[in-house]
Amino acid sequence: LAYKLSITPGIERLTEVCLENSRINADLYKELDIKRGLRDINGAGVRAGLTKISTINSFKMVDGVKTPCEGELYYRGIDIHELTDGFIGEKRFGFEEMTYLLLYGKLPTEVELTDFIKELAHQRALPRNFVRDVIMKAPSKDMMNTLARSVLTLYSYDSLADDISLSNVMRQCLNLIAVFPMLSVYGYHAHNHYNNGKSLYIHHPEKSLSTAENILRLLRPDKKYTSIEATVLDLALVLHMEHGGGNNSTFTTHVVTSSGTDTYSAIAAALGSLKGPKHGGANIKVMGMFEDLKKNVKDLKDEEEVGLYLRKLLHKEAFDKKGLIYGMGHAVYSISDPRANIFKGYVERLAESKGNDADYALYSMVERLAPKIIGEERHIYKGVSANIDFYSGLVYHMLGLPPELYTPIFACARITGWSAHRLEELINTDKIIRPAYVSVQDTKPYVLMKDRS
């Protein structure tokens, strides 16, 4: 049971003092040319490093003018469309193959892929009694905290935990990639049993199955799943596994890795970043928004009525009153998110197999209406499109994944990208990342205790 903590009047007073003395005039950021959020005035990220792991394009030069274009994403120089068409067309699961590509910079041969899958299967094991002693003993209501705690605890079981030689970090990364699904699903089962009073069941992973298949097998009481379910989950993992070095959690991995710390600490820091709702929780917000839409719109097939609800969202009159249509727009992409474009067709197939055609039709309507409405209400004409998280929550819902696991499943995918970037940082950089902060605090004299007010 959680022990009770409360915000006392004393803490409230201390908070007021902190606010009074810590606010910074927003005009100073512009005056001193400070890149807030490490972005320039147009929202583009400042150049903080080099990478070969992935490439993101959202603009092209046309007659010397920077012009928005259809979004492009490349893993190790290969277009994501070609990659997904390749492994799906050849009837393979893609997560393991794309993990090999991102870590090692080349597509594996058939023999190399077979050996790599065997290596991941070998690594898919936790220390003896780890589930009982670590995961079950202190279940948390938040699976990201459970996941981070489990990762940090694995440090204690590793006799070479602080060895940051490339081969040892490779071993650690492969192990974490392999066990993340187990840590996530087992953490949920512990929470669901001890906090929600539900039945507890722990299934062991099957070595012959893919990562996506094992996630579904571990999660479900009967261990059963369909081919389309596994295919769509595998695709979701592939599309979430890497997105450049500048996203918050991957940049966190670079920053913490540059200090020379161990792999477990670096990945736990990345998990802390991904837990933040501004980074990893977008699909949950999308699901909540659609639930609110269904409650407040009488005819879900009426474009005018749905459009009116979307305008209310933008005017802070609906859902969480934040003025956002969740799942629309992206920090990098404007005209289109290539991941969403790839995902959409498979989401439709899954919806058909589940009898969720009406939900899919509603999502498609919102995706079609929202850009025009956002343009009209916000006077944004550079282009706004659905991002990958617009559909991922619906997919996880149709797969029967509980909302508590939405962000951990994201982590099960992105651990590959974090690992690739940690290795790249170790290989290429020997300087600790240390950006500058400009002090805007006026100097003042020391005041004796008896003279303070």
Regions found by a protein language model. Name each.
Residues A2-S453:
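Non-transmembrane, aqueous-exposed alpha-helical and coiled segments at domain scale
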